[in-house]
């Protein structure tokens, strides 16, 4: 069972690597690998937690209504409880 999981993981990783190498070889840009890695690991401003106004737990974030103890989820635009992984 473990060997099958490991072989499937290695097969999948090999296919992903093959895709990346083929795509990079077709690209005419010399800086492609660097650009690709920077785009994969770049943090977009949309994913950063923002302090916004909110109306209450699991409610849509509003600009005019404020509530303490909640933060606005950047993904769903709902008011949620603050947690360490959301900071």
UniProtKB/Swiss-Prot annotation:
<keyword id="KW-1015">Disulfide bond</keyword>
<dbReference type="Pfam" id="PF07740">
    <property type="entry name" value="Toxin_12"/>
</dbReference>
<keyword id="KW-0872">Ion channel impairing toxin</keyword>
<comment type="function">
    <text>Ion channel inhibitor.</text>
</comment>
<dbReference type="GO" id="GO:0008200">
    <property type="term" value="F:ion channel inhibitor activity"/>
</dbReference>
<feature type="disulfide bond">
    <location>
        <begin position="61"/>
        <end position="72"/>
    </location>
</feature>
<feature type="disulfide bond">
    <location>
        <begin position="54"/>
        <end position="67"/>
    </location>
</feature>
<dbReference type="GO" id="GO:0090729">
    <property type="term" value="F:toxin activity"/>
</dbReference>
<dbReference type="InterPro" id="IPR011696">
    <property type="entry name" value="Huwentoxin-1"/>
</dbReference>
<keyword id="KW-0964">Secreted</keyword>
<protein>
    <recommendedName>
        <fullName>U3-theraphotoxin-Hhn1o</fullName>
    </recommendedName>
</protein>
<keyword id="KW-0800">Toxin</keyword>
<feature type="propeptide">
    <location>
        <begin position="25"/>
        <end position="52"/>
    </location>
</feature>
<keyword id="KW-0960">Knottin</keyword>
<dbReference type="GO" id="GO:0005576">
    <property type="term" value="C:extracellular region"/>
</dbReference>
<keyword id="KW-0732">Signal</keyword>
<comment type="similarity">
    <text>Belongs to the neurotoxin 10 (Hwtx-1) family. 51 (Hntx-8) subfamily. Hntx-8 sub-subfamily.</text>
</comment>
<feature type="signal peptide">
    <location>
        <begin position="1"/>
        <end position="24"/>
    </location>
</feature>
């Amino acid at each position: 069972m473990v060997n099958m999981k490991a072989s499937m993981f290695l097969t999948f990783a090999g296919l992903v690597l093959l895709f990346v190498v083929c795509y990079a070889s077709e690209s005419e840009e010399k800086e492609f690998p660097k650009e690709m890695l920077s785009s994969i690991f770049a943090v977009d401003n949309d994913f950063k937690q923002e302090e916004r106004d909110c109306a209450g737990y699991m409610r849509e974030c509003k600009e005019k209504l404020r509530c303490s103890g909640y933060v606005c989820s950047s993904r769903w635009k709902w008011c949620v409880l603050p947690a360490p992984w959301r900071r």
